[in-house]
Amino acid sequence: DLVCAAVSAVVIGGLNSLENHANYFIEIKDGYVSLNAKSLANDHDEVVLDTIITSLLTIEQNYRKYIKITQERTD
């Protein structure tokens, strides 16, 4: 499935690009990804996380029938 492949590439590629993996609780299940930061992300990781979110939201805009993005952010 095209949507699944796109989401997988964005998420796995993005998570692999994070510099400080120990700073995150990451849960990946069939059709579900959750990432919780233990502390503030460094500048590099913030850009990576913003890129993941933007990419997923773009996929969602085009394929609303197949994907739903939910964000919870605390500042």
Regions found by a protein language model. Give the residues of each.
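Conserved helix-adjacent loop modules within structured domains
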Residues: A5-A6
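N-terminal intrinsically disordered, cationic/polar leader segments
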Residues: L2, V11-D75
